[in-house]
């Protein structure tokens, strides 16, 4: 990190797995790394345990995410699903935020269930054909697929950590501390630039 700081980099892109993501944030913080923008594809920073461990050290980082509690991501059935799931998760003592994996996990099974019901089949070919030509209404919005099985329209977005104070979990229950920057249709905040401005 000190070598990167010595180059006075404008942009630092980090692609890392969970424990490395934590280590990179801590090392950058210790080295007082100060590019204009930092982040990228840091696996793990979506997890409550790492958000609360790193706390304010995350301020300013840009990272990918799939679902956050933004008004723009509240589709038909989303709030009812989250209420039910979060109550169960709390009773079980797991998933304190209750929204990183749950909405998409539910939507994936919902889509598969709808395809099986519509085709009355478990045949891979029939299911694949149906999945390719159908748009599904789910708790994560409309889901449709391209020719190769990929999403017809990507749902990965970039979000920026900001305004984190301390290590409490409750501050992560809104987009006040993790704003969706792109894509525009789901945007919940503007990028704070440069990095040091988001650190204040």
Regions found by a protein language model. Give the residues of each.
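Solvent-exposed, acidic/polar segments of extracytosolic/periplasmic ligand-binding ectodomains
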Residues: 132-200
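Structured helix-beta-strand junction loops
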Residues: 7-8, 34, 57, 134
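Polar, surface-exposed loop/tail segments
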Residues: 117-137
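Short catalytic/ligand-gating loop segments at beta-alpha or beta-beta junctions
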Residues: 95-106, 128, 140-147
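Solvent-exposed, polar/charged alpha-helical surfaces in well-ordered, non-transmembrane soluble domains
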Residues: 2, 6, 22, 26, ...
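Extracellular/periplasmic periplasmic-binding protein-like sensory domains
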Residues: 28-106, 117, 122, 175, ...
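Extracellular/periplasmic Venus flytrap/periplasmic-binding protein
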Residues: 1-32, 72-80
């Amino acid at each position: 990190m000190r070598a990167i700081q010595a180059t006075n980099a404008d942009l630092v892109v980090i692609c890392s797995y969970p424990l490395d993501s934590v280590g990179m944030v801590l090392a950058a913080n210790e080295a007082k790394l100060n590019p204009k923008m930092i982040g990228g594809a840091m696996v793990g920073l979506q997890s409550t345990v790492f958000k609360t461990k790193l706390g304010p050290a995350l301020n300013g980082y840009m990272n990918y995410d799939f679902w956050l509690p933004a008004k723009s991501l509240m589709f038909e059935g989303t709030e009812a699903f989250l209420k039910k799931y979060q109550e169960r998760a709390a009773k079980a003592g797991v998933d304190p935020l209750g929204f990183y994996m749950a909405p998409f996990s539910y939507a994936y099974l919902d889509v598969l269930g709808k395809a099986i019901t519509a085709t009355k089949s478990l045949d891979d070919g029939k299911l694949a054909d149906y999945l390719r030509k159908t748009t599904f209404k789910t708790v994560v919005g409309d889901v449709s697929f391209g020719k190769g099985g990929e999403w017809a329209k990507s749902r990965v977005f970039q979000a920026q950590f900001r305004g984190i104070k301390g290590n409490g979990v409750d501050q992560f229950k809104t987009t006040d501390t993790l704003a969706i920057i792109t894509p525009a249709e789901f945007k919940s905040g503007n990028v704070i630039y440069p990095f040091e401005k988001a650190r204040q």
